[in-house]
Amino acid sequence: MIFEHALVLSAFLFSIGIYGLITSRNMVRALMCLELILNAVNINLVTFSDFFDRRQLKGNIFSIFVIAVAAAEAAIGPAIVSSIYRNRKSTRINQSNLLNK
């Protein structure tokens, strides 16, 4: 893939993720947008690692760590959302004041 195309794709994914994270009112949608942002970061890491130094795999290895963090977030996030739904009967962000009881 050409360097500029990968950066445009990454910027597009990152923009969609940020827009969705800012405008979403549902926790599940916010988690999905966060995954889009993390995938855009991974594309950037791999692209810059390939473009600047092909012999060292620092960007690729760091993207594997980001994927591991995203996998943990994908496992823990829905569990937290389902727990909030059981207690509050809603997954809307503006209705879940967890500090107030």
Curated annotation (Swiss-Prot):
UniProt enzyme class: translocase
Gene Ontology annotations for the cellular component aspect, listed alphabetically: chloroplast thylakoid membrane; NADH dehydrogenase complex
Keywords from the named record: Chloroplast, Membrane, NAD, NADP, Plastid, Plastoquinone, Quinone, Thylakoid, Translocase, Transmembrane, Transmembrane helix, Transport
Transmembrane segments: 2-22, 32-52, 61-81
One GO term (biological process): ATP synthesis coupled electron transport
Protein's UniProt keywords contain DNA damage: no
Catalytic activity reported: a plastoquinone + NADH + (n+1) H(+)(in) = a plastoquinol + NAD(+) + n H(+)(out); a plastoquinone + NADPH + (n+1) H(+)(in) = a plastoquinol + NADP(+) + n H(+)(out)
Membrane topology, from the record: Multi-pass membrane protein
One Pfam family in the UniProt entry: Oxidored_q2
GO MF terms held by the record: oxidoreductase activity, acting on NAD(P)H, quinone or similar compound as acceptor; quinone binding
Subcellular location: Plastid, Chloroplast thylakoid membrane
UniProt keyword annotation of Cell inner membrane present: no
EC number: 7.1.1.-
Subunit and interaction comment: NDH is composed of at least 16 different subunits, 5 of which are encoded in the nucleus.
Family that this chain belongs to: Belongs to the complex I subunit 4L family.
UniProt-listed PANTHER family: NADH-UBIQUINONE OXIDOREDUCTASE CHAIN 4L, NADH-UBIQUINONE OXIDOREDUCTASE SUBUNIT ND4L
Function: NDH shuttles electrons from NAD(P)H:plastoquinone, via FMN and iron-sulfur (Fe-S) centers, to quinones in the photosynthetic chain and possibly in a chloroplast respiratory chain. The immediate electron acceptor for the enzyme in this species is believed to be plastoquinone. Couples the redox reaction to proton translocation, and thus conserves the redox energy in a proton gradient.
Stated name of the protein: NAD(P)H-quinone oxidoreductase subunit 4L, chloroplastic
Organism whose genome encodes this protein: Phaseolus vulgaris
Designated gene of the protein: ndhE
